[in-house]
Amino acid sequence: MTRGTEEQGSAWFRDQRDYWWNEDFLALLAQRWRLCDVESLADIGCGLGHWSRLLFPYLSPDARLLGIDRRLEWIQRARQSFDDAYPTPVAAGKVAFQQSDATALAICSDTFDVVTCQTLLMHLAEPFDGLKEMIRITKPQGQVICVEPSNLFNMMSFDSLTPEEDTETLVKSFEFWLRYQRGRIALGKGDISIGELLPGMFAQAGLTDIRVYLRDTAFPLYPPYADPEQSATLEPTHAWKTSATGPWDYDQVRRYFLAGGGSATMLDTQFSTLREQSQRQRRALSEGRYSAAGGAIVYLVCGRKP
């Protein structure tokens, strides 16, 4: 399965993704990866095509691109976004999309110069199987490029309200999210911090010339919270809470937390703490005294197929 069912809603493709990458950093990556020489690229688990749409201008002029996702809805929307952005290559048949499972790709071996994914492996029950499929369809001497987060770190990043929290509360918060993460893994929903494991997985799979980079983007928040990027950063938190989705989906969080060895008592205590923290954040935002540097660990790992 390319993505767990709970992670398939449009809530996971919000406007904040439009701010994930700085243009000058993308140009640097394109130079490092020699994308100007790439004549074929496959984006596995492409979703709405955010990632491959950014890479496409850096490929060779006649390059062909294939986006693959398990969900037909995402493929249709990705095709439309490419048609809007690059109508001439799309009309010329240089861009195509295919519905397929990331762990069983309906593609011949040794087909693409570059095979890439963004936040795909973190959702797979068997991420190594997904990586092996990516390698299989990569040409010899081609590149595999994966973009994946370390979300346990990201969940624990500090902000201007952290000094108000006592040490015990912060320790319990770490335990809560650690058990949540381990429960997800135990239930086959994926490892949300898989970025930390990618270099070892690449080596185990036989890739060479392995390189690891960090995304250079942060999502700072500071008064008066007026620019579009800050609005896009705040919007998912509000939307998840009002719709009881994502980290505010109590039933889902309960399943993961208990599967990670947590107790029902601790779950209710921590969920209550989360609500209190959310209320404090809203008050601080309304009073113009909330700020955060907005750092997030996202790894870009590339390797070459022998």
Please report, for each region that a protein language model flagged, where it lies by residue:
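Class I SAM-dependent methyltransferase SAM/SAH-binding core
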Residues: S40-I44, L48-A104
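A short glycine-rich, Lys/Arg-flanked "PGG" loop and its adjoining helix->strand segment in the class I
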Residues: F128-Q143
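Conserved alpha-helix/loop element of class I SAM-dependent methyltransferases that forms part
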Residues: Y19-E39, L54
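C-terminal helical/coil "lid" or tail adjacent to the Rossmann-like core of SAM-dependent
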Residues: T2-W12, Y213-A293
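Conserved catalytic/acceptor-binding region of the Class I
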Residues: S150-P247
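A short acidic, Gly/Pro-enriched loop at the edge of an enzyme's catalytic core
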Residues: T103-V115
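A short SAM/SAH-binding and catalytic strip from SAM-dependent methyltransferases
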Residues: D113-F128
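Acidic carboxylate diad motif detector
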Residues: C146-E148
